[in-house]
From Swiss-Prot:
SUPFAM superfamilies associated with the record: Protein kinase-like (PK-like) (SSF56112)
Pfam families: Fructosamin_kin (PF03881)
Family: Belongs to the fructosamine kinase family.
EC id: 2.7.1.172
Function: Initiates a process leading to the deglycation of proteins. Phosphorylates low-molecular-mass and protein-bound erythrulosamines and ribulosamines, but not fructosamines or psicosamines, on the third carbon of the sugar moiety. Protein-bound erythrulosamine 3-phosphates and ribulosamine 3-phosphates are unstable and decompose under physiological conditions.
Name assigned to this protein: Protein-ribulosamine 3-kinase, chloroplastic
Source taxonomy: Eukaryota, Viridiplantae, Streptophyta, Embryophyta, Tracheophyta
Binding site for ATP: 141-143
Transit peptide endpoints, chain numbering: 1-46
Record-annotated disulphide pairs: none
Catalytic activity entry: N(6)-D-ribulosyl-L-lysyl-[protein] + ATP = N(6)-(3-O-phospho-D-ribulosyl)-L-lysyl-[protein] + ADP + H(+); N(6)-(D-erythrulosyl)-L-lysyl-[protein] + ATP = N(6)-(3-O-phospho-D-erythrulosyl)-L-lysyl-[protein] + ADP + H(+)
The keyword Translocase is annotated on this UniProt entry: no
Alphabetical keyword list: ATP-binding, Chloroplast, Kinase, Nucleotide-binding, Plastid, Transferase, Transit peptide
């Protein structure tokens, strides 16, 4: 496991771009979860006790001598988000009063891995830690967003550059398990992509559905697909590329110069085509794909595999939000079983 504590050494003064406002913590609008205790109340308690590790880091490693303001920023119910303004720069802080540092450690490792490719802009993580009142926090770079999601052509090209630049000699997986939304995402290193995707993506989601909803019908059909999907990959050259992992419209923006920004990842090393699994709510258009495939050429059978990668996210949405997503997932499974005559 990589040492997340080392991220604290990446102070704002060593970053290639100074932190900017405004980086918003966002998840899918429909995501439902019990909201954590008010971030403002937690922070005020810590301040009163003089035990605020966020302020301590900002006023030491963050190179600030004074915090000039703290304000809440719109976000979802998984985490709370705050803007810390200082005399040195501004910082984006996410807190969670119920979950320990492991969730943010996974996010920080993913952000740092993407940042190190020098391809597409992501917020640089600075520090992950525990809160004395319970829970955890992550401090990272602020990025001031522009007025739009940016140029689709530039997004496609830079995403492909990231996939091309970052490969793993460990196989498919990641340094730690992380989360996709609030669902655990298992990233055990695996040499073979089909095995990894079968076991740790489709298989894991199907098992969760069975445990939570008792849906043996979708489980049984899903297992038949897993056992028979090898022909979908014939002729494709696959390498373990660094993926954002949760690339939907809420995790895509642009900075004030119009350059694409991606955030809130669920990173792992996987087949590059799996990055398009959230395309059903990402808004990728023709310009995006044309620019992407200029850098990362389209592999034989791409169209046949596209829905296979959508399936993982439909199954996850079934687990997160309930049976409203069941029919979409089952339709994909049934179509593949007919195609494969399985």
């Amino acid at each position: 496991m990589a040492n997340v504590a080392l991220l604290s050494a990446a102070s704002p003064s060593t970053s290639s771009a100074a932190p900017r406002l405004r980086h918003v913590a966002r998840r899918r609008p429909s995501r439902r979860s019990a909201c954590p205790r008010s971030a403002a109340s937690r922070l005020s308690i810590m301040a009163a006790l003089g035990e605020d590790p966020i302020r301590q880091w900002i006023l030491t490693e963050g190179k600030a001598t004074k915090i000039t303001g703290v304000s809440s920023i719109g976000g979802g119910c998984i985490n709370s988000a705050q803007c810390y303004k200082t005399d040195a720069s501004s910082f984006f802080v996410k807190t969670n009063g119920r979950i320990g540092p492991s969730m943010f450690e996974g996010e920080a490792l993913g952000l740092k891995a993407m940042y190190d490719t020098n391809s597409i802009r992501v917020p640089l993580p600075y520090k992950v830690g525990s809160l004395p009142t319970g829970g955890s926090f992550i401090i990272m770079e602020f990025i001031e967003f522009g007025c739009s999601r940016g140029d689709q052509s530039a997004l496609g090209r830079k995403l492909a550059e990231m996939h091309k630049a970052a490969k793993s000699d460990k196989g498919y997986g990641f340094y730690v398990d992380n989360t996709i939304g609030s669902t655990p995402q298992i990233n055990t290193w695996t040499a073979d992509w089909i095995e990894f995707y079968s076991k740790h993506r489709l298989g894991f989601q199907l098992e969760l559905i069975t445990q939570r909803f008792g849906d043996s019908a979708i489980y049984d059909k899903g297992q038949r697909l897993i056992e028979n999907m090898h022909p979908l990959f014939e002729g494709a050259v696959m390498e373990p590329c660094l993926l954002h992992g949760d690339l939907w419209s809420g995790n895509i923006s642009s900075d004030t110069n119009g350059e694409p920004v991606i955030l809130d990842p669920a990173c792992y090393y996987g087949h590059n085509e799996a990055e398009f699994g959230m395309s059903w709510c990402a808004g990728f258009g023709g310009e995006f794909y044309s620019s992407y495939f200029e850098v990362m050429p389209k592999q034989p059978g791409f169209e046949k595999r596209r829905d296979l990668y959508l399936l993982y996210h439909y199954l996850n949405h079934y687990n997160l939000f309930g049976s409203g997503y069941r029919s979409s997932a089952m339709s994909i499974i049934d179509d593949y079983l007919r195609m494969l005559k399985a």
